[in-house]
C-alpha cells in the first residue's frame, strides 16, 4: 500500500484518509452510530492483513452530512490501492456496492426502504436509469459523464420520440424545470430529471437568463447566441463589469412524490472573443472565475468538477437517497 493521503472536501463533507490503517473511521464530524454502520458495511471489503502490515482504510471525518459521499470516498481509496473495480450505486434509497456484477453489500437509510420500491420491476429505479428531460445531446453528455461516475445509465427524450415537446413558459429557472420534469414524469410514469440552465450577465440585468437558448431569436444557434452576447457587451471594456454566472436548477420528479429541487451557480466573466473547442452553449465566451481560462478550454472531467451543473448534481446526490426512500 502507498503512503498517499486522500482528501475529499465540499460544503457539507470533509474526509481525509490513507490505506495503511486497520479499517477505522474517526473524527468529530460524525456520530458514533453512523461510523459503526458504515464501518460494518466496509470492514469485510478492505482486508487489513495483520497488525504489522496493515492494508485497511484509516479515515478522519472533519465534516459530515452524506453517507454516499463517505462510502464513495473510502471505496475510491480501496479501488485505487488494490486495483479493484467496486462500484457505488445509489438505488431506491439504498447504496449498493457491486463488483464484477456481484452485490457485495447494501447500505440502508434509517427506517429502511419498502420492498416494493427496492424490487420494483419498472424502470423507475434511479440507480439503474435516469431519464433526462432534454433532446440536447451536449447537455445529455454532461449528465451522462456526471451520473456515469455514480453508476447510473442515462437516457434522454431522443430515446422517446413519441413524447411531446414541453413548452418552457415559465419566467424562472425553477418553473421551467418543474414543467419539464413533472410533465414527462406524468406521461411516462418514470423518474425524470429536468434542468433549466442559463447565463446571467450582470451588465445586462441578468439576461439572457431563462431565454439563454433563444437569445438570438427563434432560429438561435450557439454561435448566433455568442455573437449577440458579445455585441451587447461591445462597449463594456472593464472585465470586472463583464461579470456573469452560469445558473442551473435541477428538478427530479416521480409519481406520487413531491419534486426535489436543487440549484447552483458558477461565477465568471464574459470574454471579448470566443476561445476553446470543448463544451457547448456559451462555454467559448465564459471565463472561469479568476483563472483566465474559458469554459470551452476545459476537459469534461475538469468542467464537471467546477460547473454549475456538476455542483447541482453533487448537491442533489447528497439528499437524493433520503428523498427517494421517503414515502409520499
Swiss-Prot record:
Catalytic activity: XTP + H2O = XMP + diphosphate + H(+); dITP + H2O = dIMP + diphosphate + H(+); ITP + H2O = IMP + diphosphate + H(+)
Keywords: Hydrolase, Magnesium, Metal-binding, Nucleotide metabolism, Nucleotide-binding
Ligand binding (substrate): 134-139, 197, 280-283, 303, 308-309
CDD domains, sorted: HAM1
Enzyme class label: hydrolase
Region (NTP pyrophosphatase): 130-324
EC number(s) on file: 3.6.1.66
Co-factor requirement: Mg(2+)
Family: Belongs to the HAM1 NTPase family.
Taxonomic lineage of the native organism: Bacteria, Bacillati, Bacillota, Bacilli, Lactobacillales
The protein's name in its UniProt record: dITP/XTP pyrophosphatase
Amino acid at each position: 500500500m502507498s503512503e498517499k493521503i486522500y482528501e475529499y472536501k465540499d460544503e457539507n463533507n470533509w474526509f481525509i484518509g490513507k490505506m495503511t490503517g486497520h479499517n477505522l473511521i474517526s473524527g468529530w464530524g460524525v456520530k458514533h452510530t453512523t461510523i459503526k454502520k458504515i464501518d460494518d458495511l466496509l470492514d469485510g471489503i478492505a482486508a487489513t492483513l495483520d497488525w504489522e502490515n496493515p492494508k485497511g482504510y484509516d479515515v478522519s471525518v472533519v465534516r459530515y452530512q452524506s453517507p454516499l459521499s463517505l462510502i464513495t470516498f473510502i471505496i475510491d481509496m480501496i479501488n485505487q490501492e488494490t486495483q479493484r473495480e467496486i462500484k457505488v450505486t445509489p438505488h431506491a434509497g439504498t447504496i449498493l456496492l457491486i463488483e464484477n456484477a456481484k452485490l457485495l453489500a447494501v447500505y440502508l437509510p434509517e427506517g429502511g426502504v419498502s420492498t416494493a420500491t427496492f424490487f420494483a420491476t419498472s424502470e423507475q429505479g434511479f440507480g439503474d436509469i435516469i431519464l433526462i428531460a432534454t433532446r440536447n445531446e451536449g447537455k445529455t453528455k454532461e449528465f451522462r459523464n456526471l451520473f456515469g461516475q455514480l453508476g447510473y445509465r442515462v437516457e434522454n427524450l431522443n430515446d422517446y420520440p413519441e413524447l411531446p415537446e414541453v413548452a418552457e413558459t415559465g419566467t424562472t429557472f425553477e418553473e421551467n424545470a418543474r414543467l419539464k420534469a413533472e410533465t414527462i414524469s406524468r406521461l411516462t410514469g418514470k423518474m425524470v430529471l429536468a434542468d433549466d440552465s442559463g447565463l446571467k450577465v450582470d451588465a445586462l440585468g441578468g439576461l439572457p437568463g431563462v431565454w439563454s437558448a433563444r437569445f438570438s431569436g427563434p432560429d438561435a444557434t450557439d454561435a448566433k447566441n455568442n455573437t449577440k452576447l458579445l455585441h451587447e457587451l461591445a462597449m463594456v471594456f472593464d472585465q470586472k463589469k463583464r461579470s456573469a454566472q452560469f445558473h442551473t436548477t435541477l428538478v427530479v420528479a416521480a409519481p406520487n412524490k413531491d419534486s426535489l429541487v436543487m440549484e447552483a451557480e458558477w461565477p465568471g466573466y464574459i470574454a471579448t472573443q470566443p476561445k476553446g473547442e470543448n463544451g457547448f452553449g456559451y462555454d467559448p465566451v465564459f471565463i472561469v472565475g479568476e483563472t483566465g481560462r474559458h469554459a470551452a478550454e476545459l476537459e469534461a472531467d475538469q468542467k464537471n468538477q467546477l460547473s454549475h451543473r456538476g455542483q447541482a448534481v453533487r448537491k442533489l446526490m447528497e439528499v437524493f437517497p433520503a428523498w427517494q426512500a421517503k414515502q409520499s
